[in-house]
């Protein structure tokens, strides 16, 4: 409990530095893990007032030679490894590593996410749909009891900071400000991928939980560079993928898709003497380097469609829908039937 209150107090310092109010926040804040650093390794931050060197050790954070329990830097900007970020930063030791966490308003965070997730060349309505999903994804991950809410990599949403921002992405964020997808009064699971291959996947096919608004559905709009593909797989790549899932290869037979999911993705796969089923079969194909699990095999040649896990919005599908005159609300309605576009304060109750 002491550690929790220490963290809350530290967050309050950052809020004050950013000119923000503590809960009930006028601008909702998110905490993004930028980097985990080994204890003893020095990190240098560029601040408006100059450079600061810090490193973690078991007792806390050493900043310019001073040992502190944790450390917060005020905004409005800072740079880590020559990449600038909006907002403030908190440094603390957790789990034997130094955590560097960017604390900033949700809408400012999205300005650094959208450019990483959808090109500025995509139509405005597609960018707006992506902005709503990125916001919804972030809000669903908020957890005040954890040391941070989100990471900055593909494991969460890619976050590139200030230098990635563009006027087109900013317009999409501002035009949808405070709007999230909701279902039955709760913030929805806002999943997205590159290309559905013509059929979206049910959420349980990949994430084991069936959600009523994430069902397999035809997607005639998904037309991207990976809508149809073929790729050779090397036996050693397949063996590595099996081992990564905890299986030991027991033969030399090439991959075979023995059963498909309702959306047409691999559901039971046999290769190298091993049979893998369910969501793990789809993960196996991705570990083998294939663009998607919507694939069949001719020996060691994979023939497939689409890119990504296939659940939720297809980004290339959103592009085509926008080009055909659909608005972002209609795009979201196609990929998330039954959901509502809600003000954040309503969906988060």
Predicted region positions:
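Conserved, single-site charged/polar hotspot
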Residues: 1-349
């Amino acid at each position: 409990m002491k550690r929790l209150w220490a963290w809350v107090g530290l967050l309050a310092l950052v809020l004050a530095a950013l000119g923000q109010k503590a809960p009930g926040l006028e601008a909702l804040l998110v905490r993004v893990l930028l980097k985990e650093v080994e204890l003893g390794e020095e990190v240098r931050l560029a601040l408006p007032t100059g450079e600061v060197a810090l490193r973690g050790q078991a007792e806390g954070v050493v900043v310019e030679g001073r040992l502190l329990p944790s450390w917060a830097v005020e905004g409005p900007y800072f740079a880590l490894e020559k990449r600038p970020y909006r907002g403030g930063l908190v440094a603390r030791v957790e789990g034997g590593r130094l955590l560097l966490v960017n604390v900033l308003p949700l809408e400012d965070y999205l300005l650094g996410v959208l450019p990483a997730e959808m090109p500025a060349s995509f139509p405005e309505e597609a960018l707006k749909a992506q902005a709503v999903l990125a916001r919804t994804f972030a809000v669903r991950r908020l957890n005040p009891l954890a040391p941070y809410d989100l990471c900055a990599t593909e494991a969460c949403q890619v976050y590139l900071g200030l230098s990635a921002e563009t006027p087109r992405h900013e317009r999409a964020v501002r035009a949808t400000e405070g709007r999230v997808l909701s279902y039955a009064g709760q913030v929805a699971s806002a999943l997205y991928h590159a290309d559905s291959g013509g059929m979206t996947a049910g959420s349980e096919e990949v994430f084991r939980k069936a959600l009523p608004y994430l069902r397999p559905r035809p997607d005639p709009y998904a037309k991207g560079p990976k809508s149809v593909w073929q790729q050779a797989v090397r036996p050693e790549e397949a063996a590595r993928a099996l081992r990564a899932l905890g299986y030991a290869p027991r033969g030399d037979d090439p991959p075979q898709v023995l059963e498909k999911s309702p959306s047409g993705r691999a559901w039971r796969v046999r290769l190298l003497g091993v049979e893998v089923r369910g969501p793990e079969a789809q993960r196996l194909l991705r570990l083998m380097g294939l663009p998607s699990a919507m694939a069949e095999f001719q020996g060691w040649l994979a023939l497939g469609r689409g890119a990504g896990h296939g659940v939720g919005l297809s980004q290339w599908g959103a592009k085509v829908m926008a080009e055909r005159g659909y608005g972002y609300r209609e795009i979201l309605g196609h990929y998330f039937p039954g959901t509502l576009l809600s003000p954040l304060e309503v969906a988060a109750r």
